């Protein structure tokens, strides 16, 4: 059985993270599972978590009146789900629809924001990694 530290350290988002920072990140992390056809979050909900996807697929959807959901992206193993927790107003911009049973590491955004505010080097490292995704 893999430890949480190893799982996070092997995920592409945190690969190569300094051990000092890893200890801080671990304090905000938990293992989670989501069943097929459930929603991890919905547009407008408060965004306080982000996810390191380990297994499964999740569709990011937007809704328009009188239409079926529009899939704007499908995310899977090794990817990150959610960055709305990082900057105000901390609300999700999409629905996250689970397409197949999914395993992930959930990182508490409030916890990580607090640690980033207390340790600016950690904050810079996290911001650099997210900038590489959204750029």
Per-region residue spans from a language model:
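Cytosolic regulatory regions built on CNB/CRP/Popeye-like sensor folds
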Residues: 1-135
């Amino acid at each position: 059985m893999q430890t949480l530290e190893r799982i996070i350290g092997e995920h592409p988002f945190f690969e190569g993270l300094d051990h000092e920072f890893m200890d801080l990140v671990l304090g905000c992390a938990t293992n989670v599972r989501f069943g097929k056809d459930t929603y991890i979050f919905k547009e407008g909900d408060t965004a306080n978590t982000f996810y390191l996807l380990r297994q499964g697929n999740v569709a990011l959807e937007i809704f328009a009146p009188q239409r079926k959901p529009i899939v704007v992206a499908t995310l899977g193993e090794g990817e990150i789900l959610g960055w709305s927790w990082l900057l105000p107003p901390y609300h999700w911009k999409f629905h996250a629809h689970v397409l197949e049973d999914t395993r992930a590491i959930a990182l508490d955004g409030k916890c990580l924001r607090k640690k980033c505010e207390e340790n600016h080097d950690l904050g810079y490292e996290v911001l650099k990694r997210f900038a590489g995704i959204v750029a």
